[in-house]
């Protein structure tokens, strides 16, 4: 059976047993930000096992896409070095949610393996948990497996747990003996490749308590998993998963690209490289298809490490060009019938991978050179350890992940000081955190605060009101500013990319202008930069303030216009995010933002510069949505799971509380967000993109204006356009762009003609100077100082002169703003018969103007920074020419 037939026969078998065949969940678990990648078939049913969700069926089966490349379940380091580890694999599985249990699970597994797939019964072993007598007896009663092939093991091998607490239970594994003589019983659960696990049947029947006790679950579940690639190898009689038809199309394509064949050797470097490339191409393609993006953090960095590891191995095959992106089409062709999303996203995924490959290849060769220099230095010191500082330099400067440096070091017989690397990484993060703190300028040093209340918290009331009667609970006074904490405040503190509110705090004695608002733990801190007397309105220095404990009551008022501008821009970022995902693809994720009353900035994951057409589509869609004037609904304090059920996006690495705030625009956008927003998107008025740029590899930035600011910009651009029309004397129906293009072409042609005239004029000057120059034998040589000459014209004139007079040589000099430029030439006879070398001559002369340079014997240039030495340079040149020619 080929792999397609094996997969389909599994699904058909359980379909006949009354199971619902469900689609594979994405490898990016969008509803579980605690998980990097989907790494088991049960992930999509986790809520059922935790009794937090249900399904409209009680029996299910599927083939699940899985990635294990980080954390506890991590096969990355072993991929390529053996013939069965993968970072991407399929997991065949069947489940029962409170329906059938051990009897059916065991008998059906045996039926499929022996009656449908006809695996030899005498080669199969069943392992059970030593305390699970029920399963032990069922294997004897419900199957015809030899009784001495049922083996008991302890908790380490045959007891499954979701975590330290929660659902758990015994499991029964089915192993197959692949030894030549069938003597593999002692190798069961021994980690030997000759006796491998085929299928794991997990019986979830307990709930582990915090104190370690096992309490029976009210409902018992079945969760099974079987590695698809592994069962294909067994069914097809192959020694390795990589020898099956699952991988053959990829190997054939790699051979087509590189000319290197796959020979299934365990130790051959080329075969190791091909296994790595095939595996990593699968991981990258499926992850990116399901919405992941390479980046410098979280799952994005895991993918970037995988890609860079693969590129390093591609060098083994003599490949110095991007290769992985060319395997996406192969995967889409070979697996797109099972996973149609591969074909749908093929072009986008290819572009992302190619952009990543090109970016890293630009630094890979230089990084390898530096690595080789480091190894040579380490070897010369008589040690075998690459320092953590050096490993961190490769990471920080050339983008080498630690595991790539570790791999290269191991190949050279060296180790890496990983503790030193971790120390360097922590120091960098500490510096970054300190830099961020230094930029805030809001925290007073301990002891500078004066507190009027034991409470160190502030209640935010600004979602519903821009004014609040409050009491001052703490102040920190500096010479030029004042920090104020209130017990309750309508001022929004900078958070989630939204800048802090501005406005006024008024007491009986003072009016305090708030120019920024930040958070400090549970406190909201108001930065005051202007203080005025409440009666006279005169300015007061913050250092002269005094607060009477009996007069701490105040009115806090947010600048309404400022807040409304910020709300317009914040809601616009939600619309922009949604429009980008619809236009560019689901791989787009917010990577950062800044929202103020003046403008918005939105950073997002994407692999290439947006075209003008894409920007126009995004901008048009956002404005179309604004015109719909849909209400903006804010769901306050709802359970996180309910927010996800509403469609709110959750991303790995983001921290969410159990209860969250959701901002929803029906049919357009649902986001977890604590910021302030307009009540209707129609209040945004207008949206205008002003720039699109790169922030980092794989991260783009859009800056935009809304409302009045966008209108002002458009009117400014319109007036400028009208001024241009007037300058060009164009009628209303005439195109501006066409006329400007004509003028640009005309300007270019005139510049060409001017260049010709300059060169001709300069040629005349040089020829006259050469005609009047000194001769040594049959060689004429000149030294000449020129002014206001462009280097292109000079080069053309000099080359023409040496062609016209083969027995000539010269040194020309220009000087501008203290910088000296030297140009030397030598004609064909001067070079061939007399051995003159313009490169050597100009290098000698440049020493007198404190510079350097060189070039070919026929033509060379140099630069310097000492105009006082120009005459000495000329004299040196003349002396060298006389000496060289006279010697002939």
Swiss-Prot record:
Question: Which molecular function GO terms apply here?
Answer: alanine-tRNA ligase activity; aminoacyl-tRNA deacylase activity; ATP binding; tRNA binding; zinc ion binding
Q: What class of enzyme is it?
A: ligase
Gene3D superfamilies noted in UniProt? 2.40.30.130, 3.10.310.40, 3.30.54.20, Bira Bifunctional Protein, Domain 2, Threonyl-trna Synthetase, Chain A, domain 2
Localization of this protein? Cytoplasm
For this protein, the record's SUPFAM superfamilies field holds: Class II aaRS and biotin synthetases (SSF55681), Putative anticodon-binding domain of alanyl-tRNA synthetase (AlaRS) (SSF101353), ThrRS/AlaRS common domain (SSF55186), Translation proteins (SSF50447)
Q: Which region is the signal sequence?
A: none
GO BP annotations listed = alanyl-tRNA aminoacylation
Q: What EC number(s) would the UniProt record show?
A: 6.1.1.7
- Keyword entries, A-Z: Aminoacyl-tRNA synthetase, ATP-binding, Cytoplasm, Ligase, Metal-binding, Nucleotide-binding, Protein biosynthesis, RNA-binding, tRNA-binding, Zinc
Q: Could you give the cofactor binding note from the entry?
A: Binds 1 zinc ion per subunit.
Q: At which positions is Zn(2+) bound?
A: 570, 574, 673, 677
Which is a Gene Ontology cellular component entry for this protein? cytoplasm
What is its cofactor? Zn(2+)
What reaction(s) does this enzyme catalyze? Answer: tRNA(Ala) + L-alanine + ATP = L-alanyl-tRNA(Ala) + AMP + diphosphate
**Where is this chain primarily localised?**
cytoplasm
Q: Which family does it belong to?
A: Belongs to the class-II aminoacyl-tRNA synthetase family.
Q: What does this protein do?
A: Catalyzes the attachment of alanine to tRNA(Ala) in a two-step reaction: alanine is first activated by ATP to form Ala-AMP and then transferred to the acceptor end of tRNA(Ala). Also edits incorrectly charged Ser-tRNA(Ala) and Gly-tRNA(Ala) via its editing domain.
Q: Which HAMAP family match?
A: Ala_tRNA_synth_B
Free-text note on domains in this protein's UniProt record: Consists of three domains; the N-terminal catalytic domain, the editing domain and the C-terminal C-Ala domain. The editing domain removes incorrectly charged amino acids, while the C-Ala domain, along with tRNA(Ala), serves as a bridge to cooperatively bring together the editing and aminoacylation centers thus stimulating deacylation of misacylated tRNAs.
This chain's protein is named Alanine--tRNA ligase
Q: What organism does the UniProt record list as the source?
A: Chlorobium phaeobacteroides (strain DSM 266 / SMG 266 / 2430)
**Which gene name belongs to this protein?**
alaS
